[in-house]
């Protein structure tokens, strides 16, 4: 068993992002939308806003009450309009149960899709297109693995992922296999996981 200190990788990523943001002619603006009564989401968003500010990105949190919207179409239209005002958008999941998450996510312009959850970005990742926007936790996990092994080509590396979510497990599986790792995916229904 090995413990990896991720702070060094995190610092490098944030320093690199801050440097790139500093070269831009304008301050990037990011919209973060919550529309649920999920308390952990509020904590995640608070941390995202703080981290964005640290690297020079202006993050605006739209904490929407699900009662404001009659149905998915209304919320999806709201998110679609944000594409005109913001450079990037996060729809923090989960949304309230009355909304179809996929329909709302598809209203994000794929170039503005911070979490890489639009069909276009998922397809790019599967096709190993370098323009794919990848969910942050999956990308960070991948960067940590590359840093730990000291190379980008992960040939002969065997990796077990214990997660199959669309935010972490599935995109991390794709990133690793795109870089020649051999990957096993386990989850809550995997028998005899020890």
Where do the PLM segments sit?
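Anion-binding alpha/beta catalytic cores of soluble intermediary-metabolism enzymes, centered on
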Residues: 90-154, 172
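Short, ordered loop/turn segments at secondary-structure junctions
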Residues: 35-37, 64-66, 94-96, 122, ...
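Positively charged, low-complexity intrinsically disordered leader regions
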Residues: 1-26
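Short, well-structured alpha-helical segments in soluble
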Residues: 73-85
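Short beta-strand segments enriched in small/hydrophobic residues
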Residues: 27-37
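Non-catalytic terminal and connector segments of soluble metabolic enzymes
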Residues: 54, 81, 108-111
């Amino acid at each position: 068993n090995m413990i990896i200190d991720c702070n060094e990788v995190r610092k490098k990523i944030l320093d690199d992002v801050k440097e790139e943001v500093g070269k831009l002619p304008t301050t990037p603006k990011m919209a973060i939308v919550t529309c649920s009564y999920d308390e952990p989401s509020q904590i995640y968003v608070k941390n995202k806003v703080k981290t964005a500010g640290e690297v020079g990105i202006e993050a605006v949190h739209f904490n929407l009450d699900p009662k404001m919207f009659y149905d998915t179409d209304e919320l999806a239209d709201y998110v679609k309009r944000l594409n005109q005002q913001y450079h990037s958008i996060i729809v923090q999941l989960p949304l309230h149960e009355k909304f179809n998450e996929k329909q709302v996510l598809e209203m994000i312009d794929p170039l503005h899709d911070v979490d890489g959850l639009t069909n276009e970005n998922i397809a790019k990742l599967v096709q190993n297109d370098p323009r794919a926007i990848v969910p942050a936790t999956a990308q960070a996990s991948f960067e940590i693995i590359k840093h730990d092994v000291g190379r980008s080509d992960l040939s002969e590396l065997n990796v077990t992922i214990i997660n199959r979510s669309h935010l972490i497990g599935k995109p991390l599986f794709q990133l690793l296999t795109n870089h020649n790792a051999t990957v096993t995916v386990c989850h809550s229904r995997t028998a005899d996981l020890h």
